[in-house]
Amino acid sequence: SNEVFFLRDNQLMFPNAVKDKLVKTSDGWALDIYVFSPRPLDDLLIEPNMPKLTLVVKARECQLAINDKAYAAVSQNRHEATYKELPLLQGWNKVSIKIGQIDKNEFTGNFRCDNRNEFLSSLKVMYINPEAK
């Protein structure tokens, strides 16, 4: 289905249909996705070899929150924002993306794992919280 996040060239790509999931806000567009990680990624001190997950969002304006905590981009240029070492917890994580008014048409994104590509295939991504009652 064209709604599924898919692996290509060592990236977990946002599908084209993701644009249809954007919700209008007062100052732009918002998307919540739910990312399942088989292991916690939030404590690099314990395990130096832990997968380092990156999210790249194609948008001129972007804000990210992970499990409702704001998370800063390491870089933001005219075309995209890059978020590194996402502190996902083990299990399902809410990833909230906000983009600007003019960003909807170009909007896309991908997850990368610079140090352990094989980790990407163990992630799951959904649009609806699978744990919501």
Regions found by a protein language model. Name each.
Residues 1-64, 69, 84-133:
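Beta-strand-rich recognition domains
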Residues 71-79:
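Short, solvent-exposed beta-strand-to-loop segments that form ligand-recognition rims
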